Structures are given as C-alpha cells and as structure tokens.
Amino acid sequence: GLGSVLGKILKMGVNLLGGAPKQ
C-alpha cells in the first residue's frame, strides 16, 4: 500500500544520508 511505498522511500533517504560521506 501507500505506507509501504513511503517506508521504502524513507529507507532509501536514510541510506543515502547515512551512506554518503559528507566532504
């Protein structure tokens, strides 16, 4: 459902923020 999609996007965002080193 929609919640699943939002959760997936949120997870992707967290991965990008947590996995991308700030230089």
Curated annotation (Swiss-Prot):
Expressed by the skin glands. The keyword Secreted applies. One of its GO terms (cellular component) is extracellular region. Keywords: Amphibian defense peptide, Antimicrobial, Secreted. It is found in: Secreted. GO terms for biological process: defense response. Its main location: secreted. It comes from the Eukaryota. Belongs to the gastrin/cholecystokinin family. Antimicrobial peptide. This is Caerulein precursor fragment BM2.
